[in-house]
Amino acid sequence: MTEPTARTTTGVTARSVDEDATPCSERNCRIATMILVDARGWLLLQERDEHAEVAPEMWGLVGGHVEDGEDWDDGLAREVAEETGLSVEGLELWFDEVVQHSPKISTHLADHWRIWVGRADVTDGDIVLGEGRQIVFVDPDRVRDGSLELSPSTRYLVPRFLESDTYARLTSFGG
């Protein structure tokens, strides 16, 4: 895989790793997320509640910030377990880029995003909600037709995934 490249998207927000950390608006952050695809081709997404620091009451990806000193895989595993109660293995890295966005305090700041993807052999009933209003598999047509209020990062990333060869492969018979 090549080194991450810079991309610009508008309106993406971020939260701090913890209350004592410098907020992501003031530093570079590493963000590890995943997209699981079920047998119907539906995507596992999180509906954030009104208390979320990032994109309240919007739909987003499962995952979050990798803590200082934590490696990417451990950060993803921790975030997924905290949010869904799931243990994930065998995912493939689909997206690995540095994304510049507002509301960073400087144009020299950007977040490094990694998104892992894979087929899911779980259902909504297997999810143990640890964060947000709900985490469920969502019909991709709801993303395409705009009927879900997506967070800015999700609005930027998920349509690209749905148009990718990777999504086509994951939704083909035998995946």
Where do the model's predicted regions map?
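Charged phosphate-binding loop/patch that engages nucleotide di/tri-phosphates or the phosphate backbone
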Residues: 153-175
